[in-house]
Amino acid sequence: AVNRMLAAGAELVLCTGGMSVDPDDNTPGGIQASGARIVTYGAPVLPGAMFLLGYFEDGTPICGLPGCVMYAGATIFDLALPRIAAGVELTRRDFTVMGEGGLCLGCKPCHWPNCPFGK
């Protein structure tokens, strides 16, 4: 499926489901098998610790999205997507430095991005 999307000209590939470490979680292995160079599988950010980012040889990014992106107000994907969309090729260091400020406090109401999350 990933290679079909690339052949169709996708500029960004998003995969979700099965991003944990359970034996039957196949998405990370599928992304790796597609030929992507994995930058990170895991980030010091909650919600979203099981985020995966990779790049194909032509620079096309691929993200493995944990389930939290469907329900949480702000996640690692909210921190990474603007930079990916701007054409910035993120590195492992870009994620490791997110450890400070990487915990969403789940404030009600959510005021992200006007809060310390991801800063």
Spans of features found by a protein language model:
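Short glycine/threonine-rich loop/turn motifs
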Residues: 1-117
